[in-house]
């Protein structure tokens, strides 16, 4: 697996997207065996970056990613785990709670990258970013960012 270093962070060039792992918008436990097989196989062939979200299968994707990581031969430090907070959880306390819930489902002490999954309507991004920065200071998140933001909104969110 090829890697790239960006600002002192070394990342695999290809990651495993866990959308549909464990279901679609709600958990589908009938898929657990196939989902875990896919995740374990990915780990065995060298995948080290896993991307999930609290929205994927209503958090069940995070549970399965965490389970696959725990039973793998890989050390947590060798992996890069990304998860995302939904737009409905972007108030300060909601961001903190959403991250705690994600960490609980993953059964991990921290995530490498925590993203705002989608822009939200009427969201005060300053409040969301204050919470995200607190998570970084507290060691629960190593890096933060956004997903699915158009450039104009990204610039507005930085104001």
Where are these regions (language model features)?
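Active-site mouth loops of central-metabolism enzymes
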Residues: 19-34, 83-93, 120-123
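Proline-centered loop/turn at the N-terminus of a beta-strand
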Residues: 78-80, 142-143
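A cross-family glycoside hydrolase active-site/sugar-binding cleft signature
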Residues: 17, 51-53, 82-84, 114-117, ...
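Glycine/proline-rich, positively charged
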Residues: 89-159
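N-terminal binding-site loop/beta-alpha segment at the start of enzyme catalytic domains
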Residues: 1-79, 137
């Amino acid at each position: 697996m090829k890697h790239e270093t960006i600002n002192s962070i070394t990342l695999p060039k290809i990651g495993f997207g866990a959308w549909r792992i464990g279901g679609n918008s709600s958990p589908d436990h009938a898929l657990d065996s196939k989902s875990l097989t896919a995740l374990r196989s990915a780990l065995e062939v060298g995948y080290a970056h896993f991307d999930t979200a609290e929205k994927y299968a209503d958090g069940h994707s995070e549970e399965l990613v965490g389970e696959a990581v725990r039973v793998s031969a890989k050390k947590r430090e060798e992996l890069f785990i990304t998860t995302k907070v939904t737009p409905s959880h972007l108030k300060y306390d909601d961001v903190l709670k959403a991250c705690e819930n994600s960490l609980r489902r993953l059964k991990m002490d921290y995530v490498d990258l925590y993203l705002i999954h989608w822009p939200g309507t009427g969201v005060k991004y300053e409040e969301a970013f204050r919470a995200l920065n607190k998570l970084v200071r507290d060691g629960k998140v190593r890096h933060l960012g956004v997903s699915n933001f158009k450039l104009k909104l990204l610039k507005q969110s930085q104001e």
